[in-house]
A protein has these predicted regions:
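The feature captures the short pre-catalytic strand/loop hairpin that immediately precedes
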Residues: 139-155, 527-544, 714-715
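Conserved N-terminal Rossmann-fold NAD(P) cofactor-binding segment
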Residues: 30, 39-78, 418-459
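Short, hinge-like loop/turn segments at secondary-structure boundaries
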Residues: 52-57, 129-135, 206-207, 325-328, ...
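Acyl-CoA thioester-binding alpha/beta core of soluble enzymes
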Residues: 1-46, 61, 71, 76-94, ...
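C-terminal structured domain segments across diverse proteins
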Residues: 402-407, 428, 435-450, 454-468, ...
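Residues on a specific face of well-ordered alpha-helices
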Residues: 136-140, 166, 170, 174, ...
Length: 759
């Protein structure tokens, strides 16, 4: 970052989390924190995990950019560890052997301790081991991934670890803000199981708009064929995907195709009609087949049709958009050898919050060096964001989740809409006023309906901005400016305002104005081509996810929280922007570095790699995942079933998935049964953790299940469960409360249609 005042400047983080979750500390470092990694003499084992170049693991480098190292062996060096912790603000640790946490907290009662374990510190699975594949199985994603009639398909990469990292960073920052307000530290007990579930594809949170308000727990038991929602077609040089959803998009597609008469009727404006039509899909295929990906994209832009070519990762990182935004930067990983790595995921005040240095060499003896700033924090409160006013202009998943994260921790979040342009999350197949997913994802908010196209509505909104602390949005770049709310206007109305916006490709660059539905962004970032069955390049199966929406919301919330922390020491606001495509690619750091090594003709070494086994179990479509990490796991597995995968499959087929999971975990092998979303609330570990709880809504007939607590904490209360608002449900009260308007003034706004009040 070239900014002279990054938002977390002066915040000190002690990072004792090895492996891929080192990304938590790296992200906090990109936002400006001083991060010191703790590792034993000789270096941590994660330094040489996976692909290595000259003995340096690329995954290690990706997770630890910008950190320094303190070499500490516990318990022998306990005094040195306590001395470092005494000077820290946040301690990240993952069951660090030899750690005397009581001594650490006695030395620094204001320390925020984030203790991370695979399954939490209570419940029957508390001592079990997880892997990315195991977490996919246990968080509901695996059961939906793949094609009908086929075995489930493990998603590519390390999505559960990589999405959990920003969720944990968010919890750490929220607890730190609470510390700044109260002077008291905290200990968060974070279960990776929950963090991954919440930030990837939460079964009891917001789902994509194509679900039409139907939550994931109401979907069919098996894997359903969702490819018609976001269909992929072969073209002259590969594949392209269309996302023709809105009527205006269909009209653009119809004109582009030459207005074929067989599709001219008004019924084709309706999404269900188009979804059900094999003839329409065949017509799309014939029309697109002669064109290249670039020609399809150009034609789609000209006609207002959402479309994207399918890229592989090497193509994705070289697009004009990524080059223009400096999304990747070279980092020296060995003497004289530099490789490309993701250059952060957030723009702060128009400047990239990117790489702050290489990964550290082993053997360091780092001490904290950053100056201690003075923070002018709000008065103490039970919730970290109590008293904070948030204008939530976000839509669908990213926007909805960003606002809810603040609302759940005490902020007054006002969802800004208009009756003529409601949030697409409100749509439901039964035309209910509040869908189940909307009710889950917008709890604890107030509703304001305002006419932002009128001069009086604009002026009223700027009056609200003047009293707000945070403004969230995820429109296509330029939308707020077109309404008269550009960055300068907002800052003039309120110099202390913090803004956070999220878009498909970011606010700058040649692709900034592209229509950016998640399925298209996944194509442009290389993920769609990877989410296929081995050896079957056309078995595309990524339609079951809304990734990266939920994790992008966490990244945006973290950026906003960081700017609020900066505001406590400077008095000024700021802006954060997130590109969802860059979020995806940033979570492929080691893979991108390996591609750079390959392009440079460098030879990578790979030791023993973890191997994920998908084991069919007794029952109907029942499976268990096992991850064989090393020789010890192979020996443990051999002691149960023999060394061959075929023998393991035969053994598993005679047992229930619960039995297979339990026996493998008892032998020390990471394993997880394939859990369906509908079964998660009754899972013994989720019950022990208190992950879910029942909720009600006055417009929904029966109680329903939602996420409860995000983690266990000594000081952070569980979130409230105030019902999600109808459009404009609180309009009159909001303008009266925020602006001090009397009844006559509010009545005039209502009478003139400047604001709307739900009946």
């Amino acid at each position: 970052m070239t900014s002279t005042d990054p938002p977390l400047a002066g915040v000190r983080v002690l990072d004792a989390v090895p492996g891929p979750l080192g990304a938590i500390g790296r992200f906090l470092g990109e936002l400006g924190a001083e991060v010191i990694r703790i590792e034993p003499r000789g270096g941590g084992a994660d330094r040489t995990a996976g692909a290595t170049l000259d003995g340096i693991g690329l995954a290690f480098a990706a997770a630890n950019l910008g950190k320094r190292v303190a070499t500490i062996d516990l318990p022998a060096d306990a005094a040195r560890f306590v001395a470092l912790a005494r000077e820290a603000d946040i301690l990240l640790e993952a069951r660090l052997p030899g750690l005397d946490l009581d001594a650490v907290r006695a030395a620094n009662p204001a320390l925020v301790v984030v203790s991370i374990s695979d399954f939490g510190e209570q419940g029957p699975w508390r001592d079990w081991r997880a892997s990315d594949a195991v977490l996919h199985a246990l968080t509901g994603g695996l059961s939906r991934s793949g094609l009908p009639g086929r075995p489930p398909l493990l998603p590519p990469g390390e999505l559960t670890f990589q999405t959990a990292a920003p969720q944990i960073a968010w919890l750490a920052l929220a607890a730190f803000i609470a510390r700044l307000r109260t002077g008291k530290g905290d200990r968060l007990e974070v279960a990776l199981l929950e963090a991954a579930m919440q930030a990837l594809d939460p079964g009891y949170g917001l789902s994509g708009s194509a679900q039409s308000g139907v939550p994931l727990w109401k979907m069919a038991r098996g894997r359903t064929d969702e490819r018609h929602r976001y269909p992929i077609f072969r073209c002259a040089d590969g594949f392209v995907r269309l996302c023709v959803l809105a009527p205006r998009q269909w009209r653009g597609m119809f004109r582009w195709m030459g207005e074929p008469p067989e599709f001219a009727g008004p019924e084709w404006e309706k999404l269900p009609t188009r979804y059900r039509s094999a003839a329409l899909l065949e017509a799309f295929a014939r029309f697109l087949a002669p064109m290249t990906r670039a020609e399809v994209e150009a034609g789609a832009v000209a006609h207002g049709v959402p479309a994207a070519g399918l890229l592989d990762v090497s193509e994705a990182i070289a697009t004009p958009q990524m080059v223009a935004r400096h999304a990747f930067a070279p980092v020296e990983v060995a003497p004289g050898v530099s490789l490309p790595f993701p250059n952060g995921v957030v723009d702060i005040d128009g400047t990239r919050a990117g790489i702050r240095g290489p990964a550290p060499a082993p053997g360091g003896d780092a001490r904290f060096e950053s100056a201690r700033p003075a923070f002018d924090a709000p008065s103490p409160a039970d919730m970290p964001f109590a008293g904070l006013k948030v204008l939530d202009m976000g839509v669908i998943v990213v926007g909805g989740d960003t606002g809810r994260l603040f609302a759940d921790l005490g902020a007054e979040v006002v969802k800004v809409e208009n009756g003529a342009f409601p949030d697409g999350q409100r749509q439901s197949r039964d035309n209910a006023p509040v869908s189940l997913t909307f009710a889950a994802g917008h709890r604890n908010k107030r509703g304001l309906a305002i006419d932002l196209r009128s001069a009086r509505g604009k002026a009223l909104f700027l009056d609200l901005v003047a009293r707000a602390d945070v403004l969230c949005s995820n429109f296509k770049p330029g939308t707020l400016t077109s309404l008269g709310f550009d960055a300068k206007t907002l800052a003039a109305a309120n110099p202390r305002l913090v803004t956070v916006d999220s878009s498909a490709f970011g606010p700058t660059g040649p692709w900034s104005d592209r229509l950016g539905y998640g399925p298209l962004v996944r194509c442009s970032a290389g993920l769609t081509k990877q989410w296929v069955y081995p050896g079957e390049p056309e078995s595309f199966s990524d339609t079951i996810t809304v990734y990266p929406d939920h994790v992008a919301a966490r990244i945006g919330a973290c950026a906003a929280a960081a700017l609020l922390i900066r505001r406590m020491r400077t008095g000024r606001g700021g802006g954060a922007s997130i590109s969802q495509a860059e979020v995806m690619l940033a979570q492929k750091g080691a893979e991108i570095a390996a591609l750079g090594a390959e392009a440079a003709g460098l030879r990578l070494e790979t030791g023993e790699m973890a191997d994920d086994w998908l084991l069919p179990c007794a029952g109907d479509d029942e499976y268990c995942v096992a991850t064989i990490r090393d020789v010890a796991d192979r020996a443990a597995l051999a002691g149960i079933v023999g060394e061959e995968r075929a023998a393991a499959g035969q053994w598993a087929a005679r047992h229930s998935p619960e039995e297979v999971m339990a026996q493998l975990q008892a032998a020390g092998v990471p394993a997880g049964m394939m859990v369906r979303v509908t079964d998660m609330p009754d899972s013994p570990q989720y019950r022990a953790l208190g992950t879910f709880r029942p909720a009600t809504h006055p417009l929904i007939a029966a109680p329903f299940t939602v996420e409860g607590r995000a983690t266990r904490s000594e000081r952070l209360p569980d979130p409230d469960q105030r019902p999600a608002p109808r459009i404009g449900e609180d309009s009159a009260a909001v303008v009266a409360d925020w602006l001090g308007l009397d009844e006559a003034a509010v009545a005039a706004l209502l009478a003139d249609g400047i604001i709307e009040q739900a009946a």
